[in-house]
């Protein structure tokens, strides 16, 4: 009750190209922590209808409150039918950026706000020529540090991810 389209909620792992596509179409975009629960909470906080995450879970608050795969598939099919599009054509509407994800196993808690990590991020932003996004986070479910880089230039994103990984391994 009281929800409106308003905008779209993704997660910290949602591809930057999707966020940019939303902005180009004047659709507000917000990021939540990874997980349906956090997407749902952000939707509730903003009173927005639509959110989702990379797993394919799509939440539409006026229809359902969970990221059910069958419901998500039916929603995609409904969109295709209403807009008279093939799945192939719909998928060409957005060109996602290459996204590099490296998982670093660790039994130790890593200070991701350390000067070493901050400097490595700054150097990685230079490697990526200021284009793209860098995310370093501890896994919520496994003993891992996740390093994610993405941007229009795959080579730079890969180089930056490898560089960050080496710097983090130095402080583990």
Give the positions of each predicted feature.
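Phosphate-binding and adjacent anionic-ligand microenvironments
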Residues: 3-172
